[in-house]
Amino acid sequence: MASSEVARHLLFQSHMATKTTCMSSQGSDDEQIKRENIRSLTMSGHVGFESLPDQLVNRSIQQGFCFNILCVGETGIGKSTLIDTLFNTNFEDYESSHFCPNVKLKAQTYELQESNVQLKLTIVNTVGFGDQINKEESYQPIVDYIDAQFEAYLQEELKIKRSLFTYHDSRIHVCLYFISPTGHSLKTLDLLTMKNLDSKVNIIPVIAKADTVSKTELQKFKIKLMSELVSNGVQIYQFPTDDDTIAKVNAAMNGQLPFAVVGSMDEVKVGNKMVKARQYPWGVVQVENENHCDFVKLREMLICTNMEDLREQTHTRHYELYRRCKLEEMGFTDVGPENKPVSVQETYEAKRHEFHGERQRKEEEMKQMFVQRVKEKEAILKEAERELQAKFEHLKRLHQEERMKLEEKRRLLEEEIIAFSKKKATSEIFHSQSFLATGSNLRKDKDRKNSNFL
């Protein structure tokens, strides 16, 4: 990485760190007037602040850099092999199964050093992507992971006591999207995934295992892919052309997308030298031979030329979009109802007043709701009381009627008992009289018989 590019980035980062909250209002008329009032002066002698870029470069070299790559592609498409080849390092990534029930993201961080530059490299691999029968929501874990890294950085940024210089930035700087070399068109899963990622990360599409497709088919495939991306509104990363030193090569490389790549850590002897290549019965595919694949172009564009721009785009475009949406959800804005600049304190006081009014309104609603529910409950209880009273009166009336019936039956029964007793007494008297009469008659007959016998 050139010192001028590092200095340019660090100056930009220093400016962004102090004026992040007012980025959206810099185009206002007031800011324009302020810039017009700045005068340019010529110094009469040497001061020394010309060494500021060198100071920033030295400080940056001491702190080191971080770069985070997201590899999205089907299992076995060659993601790990390409990363190993790009950084000329064996990262010892283990093979993934084709039978994962859902998509998982696995992040591994490594510390690399080239000359005196230290790089903290994080590689995020999508495990199980495209292996499910239902692939409709396969992109969602990737989106959630990217948002989670943005949220972690935002929370660190919003802390009262923060340390962004020592904070391990895990935001994804580039997404290498591996496309299967079918030679036909993009899969629906690829279009859907890239469409949901293009506003959150810098996407660089690559055709994996390009040695399985002929050059003619590969060129047609590239044209077909770019046509589908444009027609579906997928925004992929474009190499910047605003820097005159790299504008020409970047413009040419933009026309070469997507890159058709081949990865390999195996060395094969070609001529008198050993090169990274793939050995086949029909010949050798050299990884770093531009006539065989676009690996060198990808490495030059990704690492040697535009790594810093990818980091800047992540911070100034994708993260700022996430940050703005989150702050707007919280009620923060740069301008008021009359399009006048609003400070954070004013926004805070306005939201505080709004929340206070909302709380009072909800408290009043809760009180009214409580009173209403109490009234409804009282009405229900009174209605239940009336029903119980009516039921009680009804039962009481039935009880009285039943009691009267029983009293009547008792009276009739007592009358029957008295009548029966009278009849019984009469019957007993009559029976005794009859018995006495019968006994008298028997004695008379006996006496008469005795007299006749004598």
UniProtKB/Swiss-Prot annotation:
It is found in: Cytoplasm; Cytoplasm, Cytoskeleton; Cell projection, Cilium, Flagellum. PROSITE patterns: G_SEPTIN (PS51719). Its main location: cytoplasm. InterPro entries: G_SEPTIN_dom, P-loop_NTPase, Septin. Residues 208-211 are annotated as: G4 motif. Transmembrane segments: none annotated. This is Septin-10. It comes from Homo sapiens (Human).
